[in-house]
């Protein structure tokens, strides 16, 4: 039997129970700018790159007016504002990760999300000492499922 050397935790919806906050951030952004989402932001978009989600849920006119990069970055800022007061690891994960670390098992975050969100989660959940490595969507050429 081979020894487990490491655990990689997906961040959004696994390491932290934050998915409703992403949906709320899209809704809040639309409210602030006075437009409607083309379709609801639901599970089908989880794991997508932020720019791809913007293109999927907003009309092309909105994307052209504001710019996809601006909209994506702004949405992530709103998400962090909304989630900060409630940010915490999924119940039971902190002791599991602490046990893994005590056994010499490395732990990492792997996320399609932007680096700013990964850093935010590590800071807001006080989990820097738990993670040996963090990988974000900024660190890879192609996001999931590649």
Where are these regions (language model features)?
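Substrate-recognition "cap/lid" segment bordering the active-site pocket of phosphatases
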Residues: 108, 114-146
């Amino acid at each position: 039997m081979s020894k487990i050397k490491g655990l990689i935790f997906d961040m959004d919806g696994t390491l932290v129970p934050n998915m409703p906050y992403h949906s709320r951030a899209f809704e809040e952004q639309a409210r602030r700018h006075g437009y409607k989402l083309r379709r609801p932001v639901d599970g089908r978009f989880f794991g997508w790159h932020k720019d791809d989600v913007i293109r999927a849920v907003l009309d092309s006119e909105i994307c052209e007016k504001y710019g996809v990069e601006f909209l994506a970055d702004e949405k992530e800022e709103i998400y962090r504002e909304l989630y900060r007061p409630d940010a915490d690891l999924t119940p039971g994960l902190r002791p599991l990760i602490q046990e893994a670390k005590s056994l010499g098992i490395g732990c990492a975050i792997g996320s399609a999300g932007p680096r700013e969100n990964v850093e935010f989660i590590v800071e807001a959940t006080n989990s820097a000492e738990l993670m040996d490595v963090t990988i974000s969507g900024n660190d890879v050429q192609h996001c999931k499922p590649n």
